[in-house]
């Protein structure tokens, strides 16, 4: 039998005591408050401390740049080209006006100078494409001590380097193990809890247990990301029989919203860890998972959504109509399907603060586990959630117009750019219809001029 030396025995005892104390602190200050939705304000104090450190780091970099007579790089959040919201016809008329002394009424159907408009638009798109840059991480104006990829790294002083090294130790040696423990706890409880609840007979007790299992697990997962969430206008929270639509940045959007409400969810089938969670959740709650590539699945989803919203006793449905993750600088085209079924729509705007950590999931670059590890090694996830007043489809509106109206309201409230482009361009080539649209607009302008002159 192997015997421990006194010194080894002391180390084992100290390790056991340390783990017991750590687990007790974890239980008392994080897990139990998460279960009951209580906060001690530790995360907000942590956020305020980080803001002071970031401000000091920015001042140090500015001072270093001034000493070397350099100018700090400032990213252009709205693009590098100033663009006014003008139509094709107005811009072509402006080019004709500046290049010809003739009156516009006497101009022919086509002028050679019109070519310059299309050449300029092509060059602008190459230099500053407003679509594809929505599928990459948002640039920061100042360094957030997460990496040395900031353009101003050459102005980092010795003090900042030491601070960065200390930050790495804190994030990887303290925060990461703590967050992994919390995430494992939350996900395990969610999978086990929803599986057990799924065996209960349908009724109020099953609904009660399902609701509280979901809320408890999502709140623990929120703590695993050190998420600091501010909810606004909670009186507008989605109600039964309605549809909750929100802009989509990341899979953690679900955790952010579901930690403050109970939803039936609609989403694409995933594999891996996400697939395990989806299969467990659907046992306890009527979530709808579908395969995007299957046409019959889409028709089935539309039918199930219609049946769901007709029953006012059923949970509100949570949908992300963009259909893909956008980097939280804009809102892209909403798919019209969820706006065709005639239900009350509850818009929700979600805005993340990128200086604490980039919440955007670039699914073409990172898998789910890799993405979660990136989140858990960031400083925190800080975001604001606005519940907007419910909206209904007007008599003279079609589904596309209604979807655009809801999208505009979300973009306006969240301070996001409202784009008409389809987020599906993230995975697909530009359709010919987009190219033909510009040709149609130009042809309409030419034909219109010709008809006007024929009448005269």
Curated annotation (Swiss-Prot):
Glycosylation sites: 247, 327-328, 362
EC class: transferase
CDD domains assigned to the protein according to its UniProt record, in alphabetical order: LPLAT_LPCAT1-like
CC per GO annotation: endoplasmic reticulum; endoplasmic reticulum membrane
EC number: 2.3.1.15
Entry's localization field: Endoplasmic reticulum membrane
Top-level taxonomic group: Eukaryota
Catalytic reaction annotation: sn-glycerol 3-phosphate + an acyl-CoA = a 1-acyl-sn-glycero-3-phosphate + CoA; dodecanoyl-CoA + sn-glycerol 3-phosphate = 1-dodecanoyl-sn-glycerol 3-phosphate + CoA; sn-glycerol 3-phosphate + hexadecanoyl-CoA = 1-hexadecanoyl-sn-glycero-3-phosphate + CoA; sn-glycerol 3-phosphate + octadecanoyl-CoA = 1-octadecanoyl-sn-glycero-3-phosphate + CoA
TM region(s), chain numbering: 156-176, 180-200
Major subcellular location class: endoplasmic reticulum
Motif (HXXXXD motif): 248-253
UniProt-listed InterPro entries: LPCAT1-like, Plipid/glycerol_acylTrfase
Signal peptide: 1-37
A GO molecular function held by the record: glycerol-3-phosphate O-acyltransferase activity
Membrane topology classification: Multi-pass membrane protein
The entry's keywords: Acyltransferase, Endoplasmic reticulum, Glycoprotein, Lipid biosynthesis, Lipid metabolism, Membrane, Phospholipid biosynthesis, Phospholipid metabolism, Signal, Transferase, Transmembrane, Transmembrane helix
GO BP field: CDP-diacylglycerol biosynthetic process; lactation; lipid biosynthetic process; triglyceride biosynthetic process
UniProt pathway annotation: Phospholipid metabolism; CDP-diacylglycerol biosynthesis; CDP-diacylglycerol from sn-glycerol 3-phosphate: step 1/3
Notes on the domains: The HXXXXD motif is essential for acyltransferase activity and may constitute the binding site for the phosphate moiety of the glycerol-3-phosphate.
PANTHER family for this protein: GLYCEROL-3-PHOSPHATE ACYLTRANSFERASE 4, PHOSPHOLIPID ACYLTRANSFERASE
Described function: Converts glycerol-3-phosphate to 1-acyl-sn-glycerol-3-phosphate (lysophosphatidic acid or LPA) by incorporating an acyl moiety at the sn-1 position of the glycerol backbone. Active against both saturated and unsaturated long-chain fatty acyl-CoAs. Protects cells against lipotoxicity.
Protein family: Belongs to the 1-acyl-sn-glycerol-3-phosphate acyltransferase family.
Protein name per the record: Glycerol-3-phosphate acyltransferase 4
Species name: Pongo abelii (Sumatran orangutan)
């Amino acid at each position: 039998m192997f015997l421990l030396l006194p010194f080894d025995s002391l180390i084992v005892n100290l390790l056991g005591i340390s783990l017991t104390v750590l687990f007790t602190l974890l239980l008392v200050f994080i897990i139990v408050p998460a279960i009951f939705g209580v906060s001690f304000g530790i995360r907000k104090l942590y956020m305020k401390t980080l803001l002071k450190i970031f401000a000091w780091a920015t001042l140090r970099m500015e001072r270093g740049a001034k000493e070397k007579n350099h100018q700090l790089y400032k990213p252009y959040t709205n693009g590098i080209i100033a663009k006014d919201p003008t139509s094709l016809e107005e811009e072509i008329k402006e080019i004709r006006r500046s290049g010809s002394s003739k009156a516009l009424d006497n101009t022919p159907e086509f002028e050679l100078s019109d070519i310059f408009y299309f050449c300029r638009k092509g060059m602008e798109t190459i230099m500053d494409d407003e679509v594809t840059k929505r599928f990459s991480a948002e640039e920061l104006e100042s360094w957030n001590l997460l990496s040395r990829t900031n353009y101003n790294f050459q102005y980092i002083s010795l003090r900042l380097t030491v601070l960065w090294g200390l930050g790495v130790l804190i994030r990887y040696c303290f925060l990461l193990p703590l967050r992994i423990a919390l995430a494992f706890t939350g996900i395990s409880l969610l999978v086990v809890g929803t599986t057990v609840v799924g065996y209960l007979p349908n009724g109020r007790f099953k609904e009660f247990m399902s609701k509280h299992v979901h809320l408890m697990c999502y709140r623990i997962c929120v703590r695993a990301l050190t998420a600091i969430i501010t909810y606004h206008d909670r009186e507008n929270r989605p109600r039964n029989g309605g549809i909750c639509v929100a802009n989509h940045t990341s899979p953690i959007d679900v955790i952010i919203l579901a930690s403050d409400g109970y939803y039936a969810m609609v989403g694409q089938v995933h594999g891996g860890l996400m697939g395990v969670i989806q299969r467990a959740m659907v046992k306890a709650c009527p979530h709808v998972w579908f395969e995007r590539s299957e046409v019959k699945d889409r028709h089935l989803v539309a039918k199930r959504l219609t049946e769901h919203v007709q029953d006012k006793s059923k949970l509100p449905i949570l949908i992300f109509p963009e259909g893909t993750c956008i980097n939280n600088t804009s809102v892209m085209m909403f798919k019209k399907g969820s706006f065709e079924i005639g239900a009350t729509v509850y818009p929700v705007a979600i805005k993340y603060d990128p200086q604490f950590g980039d919440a955007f999931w670039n699914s073409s670059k990172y898998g789910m586990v890799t993405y979660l590890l990136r989140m858990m090694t960031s400083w925190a996830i800080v975001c604001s959630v606005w519940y907007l007043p419910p909206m209904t489809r007007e008599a003279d509106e079609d589904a596309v117009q209604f979807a655009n109206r809801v999208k505009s309201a979300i973009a306006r409230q969240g301070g996001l750019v409202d784009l008409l482009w389809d987020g599906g361009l993230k995975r697909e080539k530009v359709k010919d219809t987009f190219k033909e649209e510009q040709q149609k607009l130009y042809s309409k302008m030419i034909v219109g001029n010709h008809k006007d002159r024929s009448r005269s």
